Amino acid sequence: MAQLGAVVAVAASFFCASLFSAVHKIEEGHIGVYYRGGALLTSTSGPGFHLMLPFITSYKSVQTTLQTDEVKNVPCGTSGGVMIYFDRIEVVNFLVPHAVYDIVKNYTADYDKALIFNKIHHELNQFCSVHTLQEVYIELFDQIDENLKLALQQDLTSMAPGLVIQAVRVTKPNIPEAIRRNYELMESEKTKLLIAAQKQKVVEKEAETERKKALIEAEKVAQVAEITFGQKVMEKETEKRISEIEDAAFLAREKAKADAECYTAMKIAEANKLKLTPEYLQLMKYKAIASNSKIYFGKDIPNMFMDSAGGVGKQFEGLADKLSFVLEDEPMEADSEN
């Protein structure tokens, strides 16, 4: 009875161990591949719990999401014979799920060592061997990342389709201490040169600013002077216009005054001409004789009145004609002057 219990206990333990080894879990973002007797099985499994034959079947979980492989301490010899070391090179990649079986079959589950690590060493050594230390360390360093990515992806497209390189990051290489100090000194001098150049640019900028300020100030003064000059010109033109208006008004007044005087003289002349009749002249003669205080005696006194009446009348008529002619000519001359 005791032996039976021992057998049952051993059988139960074996069953539990078999069950425990048969059940396995695949994490999200991974694909499970299976080996039986060392041979890779064609079947794969996704995330979750799965069963397999215990003891004779084993599995490996292959990541299909983005992962970063680090390649450390990669030696590299330049074309000048200087040995440098890259401390760390990071390769970001991912595996397409449907390509897991083919890649694991051809390159094992540790495919990254064969496809990525070895390729990084090879490409870096080829790059360094055709470039100088100056080019690798400074001039072409920014191109190493992209060149490595393109070279890796080109080979993987033909050798392992489904393995995609997302990015490559390369750290600054370690160079011999003496050379590094020279580069640091060179960078220091270059920095000083850049600082001096920037100071010169600042001085030039300040001078340019001062020049622009002076130019703006001169333009402002010129504009003010131009405006002032324009105001003075306008004032002079206004004064000239006012003077012309006053002169025109004065000339009009004088002309009107002269016309009035001429008209008055003409009317007086016409009135005088109308008065110079023989009867009026005879009357004026009698008044003149009557007002004369001297008295003449003699026999010719009556004849004097008779004979002289005609002569005096003719004289007064001639005088009136001359006066009328002169008065008529004066308006014409005044009109011609106007």
From Swiss-Prot:
One of its GO terms (biological process) is cholesterol metabolic process. Residues 25-338 are lumenal. Glycans are attached at N106. Signal peptide: none annotated. Residues 177-309 are annotated as: Interaction with ERLIN1. GO terms for cellular component: endoplasmic reticulum membrane. It comes from the Eukaryota. It is a single-pass type II membrane protein. Deubiquitinated by USP25; leading to stabilization. Keywords: Acetylation, Cholesterol metabolism, Endoplasmic reticulum, Glycoprotein, Lipid metabolism, Membrane, Signal-anchor, Steroid metabolism, Sterol metabolism, Transmembrane, Transmembrane helix. It holds the Pfam family Band_7. GO terms for molecular function: cholesterol binding; ubiquitin protein ligase binding. Forms a heteromeric complex with ERLIN1. In complex with ERLIN1, interacts with RNF170. Interacts with activated ITPR1, independently of the degree of ITPR1 polyubiquitination. Interacts with SCAP, INSIG1, SREBF1 and SREBF2 under cholesterol sufficiency conditions; indicative for an association with the SCAP-SREBP-INSIG complex. Probably part of an AMFR/gp78 and INSIG1-containing ubiquitin ligase complex involved in ERAD of HMGCR. Interacts with TMUB1; TMUB1 bridges the association with AMFR. Interacts with SYVN1 and RNF139. Interacts with TMEM259. Interacts with TMEM41B. Component of the ERLIN1/ERLIN2 complex which mediates the endoplasmic reticulum-associated degradation (ERAD) of inositol 1,4,5-trisphosphate receptors (IP3Rs) such as ITPR1. Promotes sterol-accelerated ERAD of HMGCR probably implicating an AMFR/gp78-containing ubiquitin ligase complex. Involved in regulation of cellular cholesterol homeostasis by regulation the SREBP signaling pathway. May promote ER retention of the SCAP-SREBF complex. This is Erlin-2. It comes from Bos taurus.
